[in-house]
Structure formats: C-alpha cells, structure tokens
Amino acid sequence: AKNCCDAIPLLSLSDQPRTHVRELMVDPCRTFIPYEQLKAFIPEMARYKLNAIHLHLVDDQAWRIEIKKYPRLTAEASSRWGMDDMNMPIKGYYTQEQMRDLVSYAAKYHVQVVPEIEMPGHEVAAISVYPELTCHGVQVPIRTTCGVSDELLCPGNEFIYEFLGNVFKELADVFPSPYIHLGGDEAGNPALDCWTNCPKCQALKKKLGITTTDRSENWKLQGYLFDRMIELLRNRYHKTPMFWYELDFKKIQPGCVTFAWRSGLTEEALKAAVENNARIMLCPGEHCYFDYPMAKGDMPEVNWGMPVTTLKDTYRLDPGWGMGEDFENNNLFGVAGTLWSECINTPERIYYQAYPRALALAEAGWSMQKNRSWEGFILRMEPTLEDMMRRGITFSMEY
C-alpha cells in the first residue's frame, strides 16, 4: 500500500452458504442459445457464487444434445419452424465435445453442469422422429408454439426403456455431475387419457396389480417409469435423480431432489419432501421464474400474459420457508432461478431477464435470513450494477 488509506486491516473471514446449491436453469430448447454465448454465461454466475447451471436440453420444440446412438434426434429434431420473429436461431444443438468443454470450463469457476432430459411429457421432439416411443405409434410434428402437448412416452412400451437407457449411458459419460434431471412436469390430464386407451399401458397396470381403469390411477404408471429410471441412474451410473414436483405424483423416492416450481404450491411440495425423506430445490414461480417480466408491460412484444416477478419478490424468498432447522439440515437442497426461453430471443435478453434478480437469488441462497435486509441489498447491488454496465453486461432497470 502506498499510504495508510490504501491499507487493508488484518482480518479473518468466516463464511459459508446457507444452501448447498445455487442454480440457474437455462432453456435452449424453445430458443437455441449458441454454444459460445451459453459458455459466456458461466463467469457472470460465478461472480455471485451461483454454483450450478441446469441445461433443459429436451422439450416439445427441440432436442438439443447429440446422442450418437440416435443421430436423427439432432439431424431432424433440432430444427423448429415457426416463431419467425425470433432473432436467435431456432436450429442448432450441442455436440458431446462441446458439452465436455463446457463442463471443464465451468469447473474452473466452481460451477457444475446438470443436464435434463424430460419425460414422460415434453418429449414431442423425440417422438417426431421416433413415434414408436408413444402409445399410438403415429408420427407427429415438432411443436412450434408455447404450451403443453398431450403427447407422452408410453410406459407400457419396453422400447422407451431401451431408448432412455442408451441416452443416459451417453449423458453419464459426458456430464460428471452427480445429478441428472428427469423432468416429470405437466404430464397430466387430459394427456393421461392416452395411457387409459393404450393396450400396452393397460397390460402394465394389470401386471402391477392396478385393477381399476380409472384415469387417476395412471399416475402409478408414471411412478413405474420413474422407478426404473431411478434404479438405472443410481445403480449403473451413480447419479441422483431430480424431478419437477407435481401434486398428483405423490411418490418421491428417498434421496431424490424434487423442484418446487408451481406458484402457490410450495408448502405442499415441502411437505411431500419431508414425508418421503427427499431433498427439495426451491424455485417457486412467484419468486424464481426469471422469464416472468420484472414489471407490468415490460417487453410486451414477447410477453404472453405472464405474471410479474419483481426484484423484491425474488429477494423475499426464504429458502427455509419457516420450516425449521431440521428441514434445512435434512431436506433443503438449494435455490434455483429458471430462464424458460419462450420469451428470450436474444443473448442480451438472457442477461436482462436474469439480472439483477439472480443477485437477489444468490444472496437468498448464501446468507442466513437474520443477516439479510432489502435496504442493505439495494445499497450493495447498485455498485454491482455499475460494474456490470462497465463490462457491457445487460440487465433490467425495472426495480
């Protein structure tokens, strides 16, 4: 130090995170994120001690990860027509070599890369080239709009287990993360009607001892599908499965990680996690859906009527949810912000939607509740945003 004003006092710091994982999920399916732009997202995350990036690689609109056993997935199902006003490509996929490079690069920043393969719903891209994955075996086109498709994988069809087994074999070799996300969301009624009318699914119900043909019992078929995938991931690849929590799917295997995402239903998800000795990732929409606008009318050209999640809404997230010390020690896994890409159409928009809400999420996941205050956060955030501006990082000023 040149003088006393430049000196740093001798001190000792003791610090540790409140939650094990502080994650951002990105969705290159609806709008493809070119590899170099995806890679550039990681250093900014690491600045704020966000330590996991969750890649939503499969959905109705595209299949984005190379699977060498099934080359048609990327040759044919990585292109989507429609939504022509998007400024980013709607064609593209990531090679396994790129993903290995991403894993290595992220590790330098202490960020792990977690892949997600959706099932049994949100699989139209795969079904478009392999219709034998369904109950009906009829080819359907890739979905070109938002929303939820009624198309599902057929749990009574042994081919889907062969298919998924081969997919996970390659993923396990590419991604060293101990976690793989299996999706599981929005495979509800009336989509489950296809299982009711499927001879293979009805034969499986009989084999499982399910005597009723009631549609509500079809959830047990999803449970069977997940049980087989959990066994595969745990026993063969030593991976911990993750899921999007759904109230109708009440069976959660101990040790799995379930994501509480539906707005207003977090308490039910927490209760299910505790009862099943599972762990939970908090990403409730009212706090953590970063694809939602931060202010009413923000970017109306791409906002299809989503609710508003303000910066303060994100900061209000209490990862402990008032559940007590036992819950935090035994069940709380982490917090996650989600960047679904129906309305994210440029690289700048990714940052705009993520920041500064990701700063609030990072603090919620790191600091104990007693050490947090909205006023203090704002004071610390403003010079951080000035630094981001100097470095050319886009962020929202709607706070």
Q: Where is each model-derived feature located?
A:
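Feature activates predominantly on carbohydrate-active enzymes
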Residues: 1-179, 195, 228, 232, ...
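Short glycine/serine/threonine/alanine-rich loop segments
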Residues: 50, 111, 238-239, 278
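Flexible loop/turn segments at secondary-structure boundaries
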Residues: 32-34, 60-66, 120-126, 181, ...
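Soluble non-cytosolic domains of exported or imported proteins
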Residues: 32-36, 93, 97, 158, ...
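Residues at alpha-helix termini
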Residues: 47, 108, 235-236, 275, ...
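Flexible, acidic glycine-rich loops studded with aromatic residues
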Residues: 241-247, 251-399
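Active-site neighborhood of glycoside hydrolase catalytic domains
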Residues: 126-132, 136, 141-257, 262-277
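Acidic-residue sensor for enzyme active/binding pockets
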Residues: 116-118, 186, 363
